[in-house]
């Protein structure tokens, strides 16, 4: 009996010890969970976008909006909506309250998106799949066997895309929102790096990149959908082409060290190669290009200018500090620095709003009087007075 009593006592002691260990483990887990929550709240830092004189920082509706990841995030203006691309999904947000109007998982390895007023084209660059979405509905997803290079979408839902060619270098194709073929063209000169379609879907532009003696040789082509060959082509400066975009009948060409505007079959270089370094750019609601540039790389003094479709540089002004991003809306431009967001009047360069931020802010998107701030895995809304 004594032996049995001792065994029973040992079992009871072991049970109490195990219970104590489990209690300690749960306490530790609870503390860790609380610490994680606190760290996340500190990371979001809701109060760090406090405005300066005459400003108001208000978080409304579902803002701050939580993203499903922090890598590869881009925010686009899609008409009066916000299109948000992450490494896992494409989402359209109502900018007034942050509510999702559409979201879809894309499953692409290297997703890129382009937006018109109503349509979104999202594709897997270097991969095979491309999808077109409209007002919360997926119209189609196609598969290309040779590898997609770039794509754009018009206001009427036409999609132009370039892919690697089985016979030449690049294939350019235009399809409608119902997947009807409208144009096909194959190019031997080089791989297409940039592509654009006019708002009304009547013509396209694309840049093909070649090289000689270790020097880049980009060439711009213009082509009407009704034609079988480009109606114009231009040799561009030997630097990276950052973007091409139609605004009305005019085409902007933004290079790493130049800016040009094409009207008809004439190209005018507005900012000359070798004299500027492009830092950041955006397009205003009026159709003008707003660009920040400096005289050399990594400069802390930059010039911000509005360039009209006619190729005129309107009232450039100087800002101090390294620029991370900018976004234009109407007559104003928001500029992101390492520790601040400043909003300037394009007419005279005067500062109308200042908000503090941290270096964790990666991009900004301005719509009307609001600035949407992407910080890691959240999008915050900064409201300013008009």
PLM region spans:
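Solenoidal tandem-repeat scaffolds enriched in leucines and small polar residues
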Residues: 168-262
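Structural motif
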Residues: 43, 89-91, 128-132, 167-174, ...
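Blade-level signature of beta-propeller repeat domains, shared across WD40, Kelch, NHL, RCC1
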Residues: 356-386
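A short beta-strand motif characteristic of beta-propeller blades
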Residues: 53-68, 97-105, 136-143, 180-186, ...
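Non-cytosolic head/periplasmic domains of membrane-anchored proteins
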Residues: 102-207, 214
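Residue position within the beta-strands of beta-propeller blades
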Residues: 84, 122, 161-162, 205-207, ...
